[in-house]
Amino acid sequence: MAELFYDDDADLSVIQRKKVAVIGYGSQGHAHALNLRDSGVDVRVGLREGSASRAKAENEGLKVLTVPEAVKEADVVVILAPDQHQRGLYTADIEPNLNPGTTLVFGHGFNIRYGYIKPSADLDVVMVAPKGPGHLVRREYVDGRGVPVIVAVEQDATGGAWELALSYAKAIGGLRAAGIKTTFTEETETDLFGEQAVLCGGVSQLVQYGFETLTEAGYQPEVAYFEVLHELKLIVDLMYEGGIAKQRWSVSDTAEYGDYVSGPRVIDPRVKENMQAVLADVQNGAFAARFIADQDAGAPEFAELRAKGEAHPIEGVGRELRKLFAWVKPSDSDYTEGSAAR
């Protein structure tokens, strides 16, 4: 069983005695910074020169500095920049400006697990990773609740890394729900596998193949869209609420019976073997090496794959159908319809 921690297991004053620099102000960065501030922590945000997020952070009343300036002021540096940017950011702006005995806090273990960032042995290195998007982390905190977090320690140079990690987790509201003890390796490998085999890669491919199967058989694309993509939210919401059993309880007997007899025909043992191969690439570093090499080259493979996905017929059909959905309101003002680019 996993080891769990709650508010009573952490001393908030530990992080309140520190000066914290949150590097990055995206989905997680803004939630961490605001929750820390509202928990009485001395926090500043480190952003690159010209960052579009500067005004947003300043409008929230946060102190905003360049990354080197923020790091120089801090006892705790929270690295929440995208995985592919962390290595360069750490080498150029963070590492040269670290104070002795600084604690590094990560929201994901990628760069530590695969060795792209190698902190010196005198630093504490911890991870506090909420299991939800930043807007939910912030909203739950404001409402007096919290999103569960996973907590790990990679280096404990001072002997106080766990105490600080739990204090930090409490400050962002995570221990109101629960903190789950893990390792950088476990978090990274399970997170990447889940994204690739199920949550992103697996589901996206399954939906596209379902759409292609129906339209190639002569069914209307609009009807196919409803059956394989639109209604997916209804099923996922039921799973989210009560697991697979709750989903099966909620659907018709016809749908439940079809689940049992046809699901294994589509997702057969070969799929599990393919999943095991994906996991192996995550474990041995092959995926990480491929991703970082492509990013270092300007991301040509990434751009090609993204463009291919955007050009799939289901995207055009969906754009037109969603115009009919008065109940669906765009939640991201900076999103361009039909594009995965950020």
UniProtKB/Swiss-Prot annotation:
A GO MF term: magnesium ion binding
A single GO BP: L-valine biosynthetic process
Catalytic site: H108
Signal peptide start and end residues: none
UniProt pathway annotation: Amino-acid biosynthesis; L-isoleucine biosynthesis; L-isoleucine from 2-oxobutanoate: step 2/4; Amino-acid biosynthesis; L-valine biosynthesis; L-valine from pyruvate: step 2/4
Keywords (A to Z) from UniProt: Amino-acid biosynthesis, Branched-chain amino acid biosynthesis, Magnesium, Metal-binding, NADP, Oxidoreductase
Cofactor section: Mg(2+)
Name the UniProt record assigns to this protein: Ketol-acid reductoisomerase (NADP(+))
Classification lineage: Bacteria, Bacillati, Actinomycetota, Actinomycetes, Micrococcales
Underlying gene: ilvC
